[in-house]
């Protein structure tokens, strides 16, 4: 609603009063207008920006401070899909980035606390269970899947209590962080106690989550980022990865040959599942570098490995303003001299001109096919039991956030006992739900409910044996001691030094790049073979056959891995200072990589042909016998 005095004014001042004041950096008048509360603080201007987005893009710090203090949403995206924080980084203004980052973290905490009662109600209604979520990483590039570790999340749910055990903690300084941790969520009436149990250090960090009684200033003070955190953002590219599913379609996978094809089903952890393929899934990665110095831009380019050069990725580079010639510059925030009348006129076409620092953007797009294994008879409910847990984990875990984005689609009926979704351009994540209520492997803290261990009357022996999982895993009883702090552990408050857990994709993206290189320095040169086998420069990774033989052979202390037969021996180092071998040319590296992929593909085709011939032979024999 626009106030009477604003509606009486003509032009942009009347239609977009907050935006107009932001444009002219009149922060004192903006404060009065916002305090009056008669204008929507999230109103969009003709270019798809909120007042906060416009203030950030223009670098008007005091206007941004006023809007943030009155609750402007930091998480909103503009028409181009960029957040307020990403636009703040583009300005290179350290104080502005620090301010926006502080309020972003504060608003996340408030939203998380406000959602506690809803989450508690969902947990209260859901049936108790124990389940294991196994994360595996796969890739179409041979041997690359080993660059990401696998992990099994163990989940206990009892009443309003939840516990998740993990060994994969996250990423810090471009490396994968491992440890033995438990996260306990213990619900109360309108609040919850959260414990992070560090089993390696025998320390328990506790925190009470409740929006009521929380002091706003204390929460804001706790969200204050360090200068190091701000500088790390200003010296790294802005990276965002999106899973575009607007054109997604699900189809049943087929099996068999020619006229003998049928809909595919597979057994997954004792459950018969229908296999679906999801097509038209696009993974879009956008990278902005206009805020980086030439030195840091050089580092980013140096991180590009030969592997990234031949991947099947459509890559577009956009220079400043996508090629628009900038002939006059009023300021860094308005390099193409756009006037207020032009900006606020919805009928005026700006073309490639825009506000803010000229954007240097790289966009990578690749199409993927996701897979689903759905069981209609599974005891777990995706919406009632699993979704609340994924929502809780997605707050601070980028992998769970992507899983949540996928399962919120309109999936075919059934529980997804296994899901394979793209995470990055060369990596898929395969998530498998198993050991429900400790039915596959006993869990000391879990025992089956007496009512769930007896098959229903009237069931014959064959049906009992074939559906043992579904009959004996319907319920369980979980020991209350699981949700208590272990004896002998030190108890500490919630304030502690910890790596920032950010659900942005940039740290994860860099961790994967670093794993691909796995060299002592980002300047080390790696060959295609080293990238594919994840070996350090100068080493000789063994062939696929050698690896297979090595698994079956007893361990030998001094075993030296042999180079693959199809790869020519690299030249010896030319001197004591040489850091490793280098192949003769990029063309040779590319040829070797494609050779390796072709061998892998040929092996898959050979196995498929062999299976089809065997099936055809069996069918012919069966027809002959008849």
Swiss-Prot record:
Keyword Repeat: yes
Residues that bear N-acetylmethionine: 1
SUPFAM superfamilies: Ankyrin repeat
Annotated localization: Cell membrane; Late endosome; Early endosome
GO terms under cellular component: cytoplasm; early endosome; intracellular membrane-bounded organelle; late endosome; perinuclear region of cytoplasm; plasma membrane
InterPro entries linked to this entry: ANKRD13 (IPR021832), ANKRD13_C (IPR055285), Ankyrin_rpt (IPR002110), Ankyrin_rpt-contain_sf (IPR036770), UIM_dom (IPR003903)
Keyword Secreted: no
Comp. bias intervals (Pro residues): 554-573
GO terms for biological process, alphabetical: negative regulation of receptor internalization
Stretches the record annotates as Disordered: 442-474, 534-590, 595-614
Keywords: Acetylation, ANK repeat, Cell membrane, Endosome, Membrane, Repeat
GO terms for MF: ubiquitin-modified protein reader activity
Top-level taxon of origin: Eukaryota
Composition skew (Low complexity), residue ranges: 449-472
Segments forming a coiled coil: none
Function, in words: Ubiquitin-binding protein that specifically recognizes and binds 'Lys-63'-linked ubiquitin. Does not bind 'Lys-48'-linked ubiquitin. Positively regulates the internalization of ligand-activated EGFR by binding to the Ub moiety of ubiquitinated EGFR at the cell membrane.
PANTHER family, per database record: ANKYRIN REPEAT DOMAIN-CONTAINING PROTEIN 13, ANKYRIN REPEAT DOMAIN-CONTAINING PROTEIN 13B
Assembly notes: Interacts with EGFR (ubiquitinated); the interaction is direct and may regulate EGFR internalization.
UniProt name for this protein: Ankyrin repeat domain-containing protein 13B
Provenance organism: Homo sapiens
């Amino acid at each position: 609603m626009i106030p009477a005095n604003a509606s009486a004014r003509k032009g942009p001042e009347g239609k977009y009063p907050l935006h107009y004041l932001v444009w002219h950096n009149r922060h004192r008048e903006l404060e009065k207008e916002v305090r009056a509360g008669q204008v929507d603080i999230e109103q969009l201007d003709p270019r798809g920006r909120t007042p906060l987005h416009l203030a950030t893009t223009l670098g008007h710090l005091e206007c941004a401070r006023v809007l943030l203090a009155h609750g402007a949403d930091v998480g909103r995206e503009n028409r181009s899909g960029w957040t307020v924080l990403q636009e703040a980084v583009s300005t290179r203004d350290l104080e502005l980035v620090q301010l926006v980052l502080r309020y972003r973290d504060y608003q996340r905490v408030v939203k998380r606390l406000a959602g506690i009662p809803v989450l508690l109600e969902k947990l209260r209604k859901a049936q108790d269970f124990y389940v294991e979520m196994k994360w595996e990483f796969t890739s179409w590039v041979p041997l690359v899947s080993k660059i990401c570790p696998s992990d099994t999340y163990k989940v206990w749910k009892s009443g309003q209590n939840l516990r998740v055990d993990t060994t994969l903690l996250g990423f810090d300084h471009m490396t994968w962080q491992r440890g033995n941790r438990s996260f306990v969520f213990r619900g109360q009436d309108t609040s919850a106690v959260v414990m992070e149990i560090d089993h390696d250090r025998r320390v328990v960090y506790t925190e009470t989550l409740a929006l009521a009684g929380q002091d706003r200033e204390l929460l804001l003070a706790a969200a204050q980022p360090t200068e190091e955190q701000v500088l790390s953002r200003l010296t790294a590219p802005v990276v965002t990865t999106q899973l575009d599913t607007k054109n997604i379609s699900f189809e049943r996978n087929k099996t068999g040959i020619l006229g003998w094809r049928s809909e595919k089903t597979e057994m997954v952890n004792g459950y018969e599942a229908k296999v679906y393929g999801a097509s038209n899934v696009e993974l879009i990665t956008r990278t902005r570098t206009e805020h980086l110095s030439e030195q840091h831009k050089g580092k980013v380019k140096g991180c590009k490995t030969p592997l990234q050069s031949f991947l099947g990725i459509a890559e577009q580079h956009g220079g400043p303003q996508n090629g628009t010639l900038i002939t006059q510059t009023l300021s860094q925030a308005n390099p193409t001299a756009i006037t207020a009348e032009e900006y606020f006129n919805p009928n005026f076409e700006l073309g490639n001109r825009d506000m803010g620092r000229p954007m240097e953007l790289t966009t990578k797009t690749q199409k993927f096919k996701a897979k689903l294994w759905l069981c209609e008879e599974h005891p777990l409910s995706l919406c009632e039991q699993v979704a609340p847990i994924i929502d809780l984990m997605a707050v601070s875990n980028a992998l769970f956030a992507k899983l949540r984005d996928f399962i919120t689609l309109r999936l075919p009926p059934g529980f997804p006992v296994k899901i394979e979704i793209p995470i990055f351009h060369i990596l898929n994540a395969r998530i498998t739900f198993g050991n429900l209520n400790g039915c596959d492997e006993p869990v000391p803290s879990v025992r089956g409910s007496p009512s769930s261990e007896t098959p229903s009357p009237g069931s014959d022996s064959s049906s009992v044996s074939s559906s043992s999982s579904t009959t004996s895993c319907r319920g369980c009883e979980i020991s209350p001691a699981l949700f208590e702090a272990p004896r002998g552990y030190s108890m500490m408050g919630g304030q502690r030094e910890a790596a920032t857990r950010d659900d942005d994709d940039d740290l994860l993206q860099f961790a994967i790049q670093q794993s691909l290189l796995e060299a002592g320095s980002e300047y080390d040169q790696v060959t295609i073979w080293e990238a594919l086998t994840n070996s350090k420069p100068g080493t000789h990774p063994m062939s696929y056959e050698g690896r297979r033989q090595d698994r079956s052979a007893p361990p030998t202390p001094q075993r030296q891995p042999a180079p693959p037969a199809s790869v020519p021996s690299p030249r010896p180092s030319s001197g004591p200072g040489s850091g490793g071998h280098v192949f003769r040319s990029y063309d040779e590296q590319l040829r070797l990589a494609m050779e390796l992929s072709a061998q892998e593909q040929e092996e898959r085709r050979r196995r498929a042909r062999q299976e089809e011939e065997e099936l055809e032979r069996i069918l012919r024999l069966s027809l002959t016998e008849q």
